[in-house]
């Protein structure tokens, strides 16, 4: 590989970043995968697989490991950031002075900025300026299934149509990975944050033992909360019926590969928040997302009762069963109402 002709540099060598890098390389593209821990990258290079997260999925020959950030960012104009949302801004500020003049940035991070609840597009603009093309990919994607080449579909939105077209061509694989373009940059970002919150609630419901009826009701009303918040932010309501909305929501709420769902199940079974996080052993994005989504909802005056009750459990010590009963005991309403 020539030092400057990779199709993509992926920032973040966790399970999802590695899975996306594998997918790109499997499509025949030269891909550079960077991680912050040189020892981890050396292990990946030695094993030619990510044994910790994605065992038995060998790296294609066109996937190149890199621990030097300068070299990684020089390799491609296209940068795919796949890091937890609470370090997203920090990572962008770190890479900005090292990026090529023609750089374009896409992220697969799902969530909002820690503490402020800002959309990641606002974090990116603040860190990188107004000129760089931005894009986001989001949808129902478990890393293990994606890396294994099982059929998967996502949504892609960008501030730049040329960048969107290029990304769709790079990522799309007719055999296993379908990429839908979507002009709704706000909606595609927001769905990935709110679904994490609702997935914790779905897990709580199942952990309590409320059954499939309750889980489905919670998913449906969670989608309504997502759509209301999206409308307040200027998103297209139709986006939330697509991959980045309903698709990701159903996946995360119903399958135990979801850390957010498993976390919620433990809470529903009576485990405390700290112990549940420790037992998961990886980042539970929904824990922070709950606080961030609640902040955003308050800022825009959007009522989100499910989000509020999950917040009460996570941050105020409320019992999960009590929170569920609070939701069930709310006043009768028209299903189509805005609250």
UniProtKB/Swiss-Prot annotation:
Domain of life from the UniProt record: Bacteria
Cellular compartments annotated: Cytoplasm
Record-listed NADPH binding positions: 15-16, 36, 110, 143, 259, 283, 285
GO cellular component: cytosol
UniProt keyword annotations, A-Z: Cytoplasm, Lipid biosynthesis, Lipid metabolism, NAD, NADP, Nucleotide-binding, Oxidoreductase, Phospholipid biosynthesis, Phospholipid metabolism
Enzyme nomenclature, EC number: 1.1.1.94
Active site: 195 (proton acceptor)
Pathway noted in the entry: Membrane lipid metabolism; glycerophospholipid metabolism
Reaction catalysed by this enzyme: sn-glycerol 3-phosphate + NAD(+) = dihydroxyacetone phosphate + NADH + H(+); sn-glycerol 3-phosphate + NADP(+) = dihydroxyacetone phosphate + NADPH + H(+)
One GO biological process term: glycerol-3-phosphate biosynthetic process
Keyword Lipid metabolism: yes
Positions bound to sn-glycerol 3-phosphate: 110, 139, 141, 195, 248, 258-260
Keyword field contains Transferase: no
Molecular-function annotations in GO: glycerol-3-phosphate dehydrogenase [NAD(P)+] activity; NAD binding
UniProt cross-references to HAMAP family, sorted A to Z: NAD_Glyc3P_dehydrog
Protein family: Belongs to the NAD-dependent glycerol-3-phosphate dehydrogenase family.
Function: Catalyzes the reduction of the glycolytic intermediate dihydroxyacetone phosphate (DHAP) to sn-glycerol 3-phosphate (G3P), the key precursor for phospholipid synthesis.
Protein name (record): Glycerol-3-phosphate dehydrogenase [NAD(P)+]
Organism field: Shigella flexneri serotype 5b (strain 8401)
Gene name for this UniProt entry: gpsA
């Amino acid at each position: 590989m020539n030092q400057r002709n990779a199709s993509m540099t992926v920032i973040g060598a966790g399970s999802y970043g590695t899975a996306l890098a594998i997918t790109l390389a499997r499509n025949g593209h030269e891909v550079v995968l960077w991680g912050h821990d040189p020892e981890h990258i050396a292990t990946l290079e030695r094993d030619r697989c990510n044994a910790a997260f994605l065992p038995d999925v060998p790296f294609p020959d066109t996937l190149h490991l890199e621990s030097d950030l300068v070299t990684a960012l020089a390799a491609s104009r296209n940068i795919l950031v796949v890091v937890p949302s609470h370090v997203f801004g920090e990572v962008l500020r770190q890479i900005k002075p090292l990026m090529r003049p023609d750089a374009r940035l896409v992220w697969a991070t799902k969530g909002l900025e820690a503490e402020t609840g800002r959309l990641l597009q606002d974090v990116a603009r603040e860190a990188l300026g107004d000129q760089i093309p931005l894009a986001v990919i989001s949808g129902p994607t478990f890393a293990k299934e994606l890396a294994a080449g099982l059929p998967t579909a996502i949504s892609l939105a960008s501030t730049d149509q040329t960048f969107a077209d290029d990304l769709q061509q790079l990522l799309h694989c007719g055999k296993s990975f379908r990429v839908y373009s979507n002009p709704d940059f706000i909606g595609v970002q927001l769905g990935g944050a709110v679904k994490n919150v609702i997935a914790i609630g779905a897990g709580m419901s199942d952990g309590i033992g409320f059954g499939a009826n309750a889980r489905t009701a919670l998913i449906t009303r969670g989608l309504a909360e997502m759509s209301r918040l999206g409308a307040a932010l200027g998103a297209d309501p139709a986006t939330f019926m697509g991959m980045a909305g309903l698709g990701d929501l159903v996946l995360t709420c119903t399958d135990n590969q979801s850390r957010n769902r498993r976390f919620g199940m433990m809470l529903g079974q009576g485990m405390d928040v700290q112990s549940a996080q420790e037992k998961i052993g990886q980042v539970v994005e929904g824990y922070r997302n709950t606080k961030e989504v609640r902040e955003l909802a308050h800022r825009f005056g959007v009522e989100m009762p499910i989000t509020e009750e999950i917040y009460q459990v996570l941050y105020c010590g409320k019992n999960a069963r009590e929170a569920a009963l609070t939701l069930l005991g709310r006043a009768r309403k028209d299903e189509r109402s805005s609250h």
